Curated annotation (Swiss-Prot):
Binding site for Zn(2+): C127, C130, C155, C158
CDD domains: SIRT5_Af1_CobB
Swiss-Prot/TrEMBL domain comment: 2 residues (Tyr-67 and Arg-70) present in a large hydrophobic pocket are probably involved in substrate specificity. They are important for desuccinylation activity, but dispensable for deacetylation activity.
Source species of the chain: Pseudomonas putida (strain ATCC 47054 / DSM 6125 / CFBP 8728 / NCIMB 11950 / KT2440)
Job description of the protein: NAD-dependent lysine deacetylase and desuccinylase that specifically removes acetyl and succinyl groups on target proteins. Modulates the activities of several proteins which are inactive in their acylated form.
Keywords: Cytoplasm, Metal-binding, NAD, Transferase, Zinc
GO cellular component: cytoplasm
Keyword Zinc among record annotations: yes
GO MF annotations in UniProt: histone deacetylase activity, NAD-dependent; NAD+ binding; protein-malonyllysine demalonylase activity; protein-succinyllysine desuccinylase activity; zinc ion binding
Binding site for substrate: Y67, R70
Protein name: NAD-dependent protein deacylase
Catalytic activity from the UniProt record: N(6)-acetyl-L-lysyl-[protein] + NAD(+) + H2O = 2''-O-acetyl-ADP-D-ribose + nicotinamide + L-lysyl-[protein]; N(6)-succinyl-L-lysyl-[protein] + NAD(+) + H2O = 2''-O-succinyl-ADP-D-ribose + nicotinamide + L-lysyl-[protein]
Subcellular location: Cytoplasm
């Protein structure tokens, strides 16, 4: 039996499915890679040096402007057929949830719910000082003109600077997000890991967490992730091709609207 048929059988037998997603699921959505498509002002900067609390303390205007630009790039991207396959499975009767390492909002725009963001979201803003979430107007979130830097807005409660609601390097995962992820994974009977690197802890331990409670794990990746468990199934290929094929093999129609990459 092929791995695709094995995966389809596992999906048919399941009731509660968690999709655990990483950068690979958004690869076909046109979100620019940092190094290949940086232009103008941002070509001078190493993105990893801008994604720390120390960088924000040293130059909050530069870091805030960088994230406004990133947010704009994400807003121009569209959910691809991999994102769209997940709510299609939910519509067909499965209990489906998403735990993602991505900071884009493509799962939400595809129609998935609930979505747990382990690393925060570019769409969220919080105070650097008191850590409370904040709401901003569209004007305050407008992308800066080329070469222009914008001072971050201030918190209405403590007057601290506002920052992106993402997890920076050397920061811990949000407690609420991690607890929600653990609860969902421990309650699932099938986990589909899509486009994850498998190296960033503690999130990299999520597939093993699912296996420990008796769930089957399907890995979707461009290359073999080196799994060795009897309850693991490897599907190699782009997520935008593999997930629709899995749904079709299971008997669920997985059609993409015009203009969506497949």
């Amino acid at each position: 039996m092929s791995n695709l048929r094995r995966a389809a059988e596992a999906l048919r037998r399941s009731k509660t499915v968690v999709f655990f997603t990483g950068a690979g699921i958004s690869a076909d959505s046109g979100i620019p890679t940092f190094r290949d498509k940086l232009t103008g002002l941002w070509a001078k900067h190493d993105p990893q040096r801008l994604e720390t609390a120390d960088a924000f303390r040293a130059n909050p205007t530069l870091v805030w402007s960088w994230y406004l630009w990133r947010r704009h790039q994400v807003s121009q991207a569209k959910p691809n057929s991999a994102h769209l396959s997940i709510p299609q499975l939910a519509d067909a009767g499965w209990d489906v949830s998403v735990v993602t390492q991505n900071i884009d909002d493509l799962h939400e725009r595809a129609g998935s719910s609930p979505v747990v963001h382990l690393h925060g979201s570019l769409m969220d803003v919080k105070c650097f000082g008191c850590h409370r979430p904040a709401e901003l107007s569209p004007d305050q979130l407008a992308v800066p003109l080329e070469g222009q830097l914008i001072e971050p807005p201030r918190c209405t409660r403590c007057n601290g600077r506002l920052r992106p609601g993402v997890v920076w390097f050397r920061e811990n995962l949000p407690d609420n997000a991690w607890r929600s992820a653990v609860r969902l994974v421990r309650a699932c009977d099938l986990l589909v890991s899509v486009g994850t690197s498998g190296v960033v802890m503690p999130a990299a331990g999520i597939p093993d967490m699912a296996l420990a409670v008796g769930a089957t794990v399907i890995h979707v990746n461009l290359e073999d992730v080196g799994m060795d468990g009897a309850d693991e199934i490897m599907l190699e290929g782009p997520a935008g091709v593999v997930l629709p094929a899995l749904l079709q093999a299971t008997g669920v129609a997985a059609l993409s609207p015009p203009g969506v990459p497949t």
